């Protein structure tokens, strides 16, 4: 199994269990998320409330919860939405920090295409949700999510050059 860690924070953000599609000349990865139901586990502890005079079962109120698989699996933390100014400021800092970690062809491809990828994200800004890794590192990569028109499940966007492949 391959896990993809954020090169800046070390947080696990994705794995090969979630197939991706390349966008913007490979600078962005697009990954489909899915809503899944968690919880509502029926546990039989062997008690017999009717024999003990209890009419109602006073068990734990275990509610089923819907979560997005990627968010839950990698413990992503949702962040407040960015306005255009905040987004551009964040991207400038991210590009600078990530460029320092890249070299050779990776750096060339990233620098050549990151502007178009940023414009692509900027065009969707009002529809984006923002997530960071579990550590909530200030300079870590941001994972973007949005809903395609008519879709019930979110689509996630990652900066491919910001991910480090690790074998588990």
UniProtKB/Swiss-Prot annotation:
UniProt keyword annotations, A-Z: Calcium, Cytoplasm
Origin superkingdom: Eukaryota
One GO CC term on file: cytoplasm
Family matches, as PROSITE patterns: TCTP_1, TCTP_2, TCTP_3
Coiled coil (residue ranges): none
SUPFAM superfamilies: Mss4-like
Keyword Flavoprotein part of the UniProt annotation: no
Pfam families on file: TCTP
Bilayer-spanning residue ranges: none
Annotated ranges, domain TCTP: 1-168
Intracellular or extracellular location(s): Cytoplasm
Similarity-based family: Belongs to the TCTP family.
Protein name: Translationally-controlled tumor protein homolog
Record organism: Triticum aestivum (Wheat)
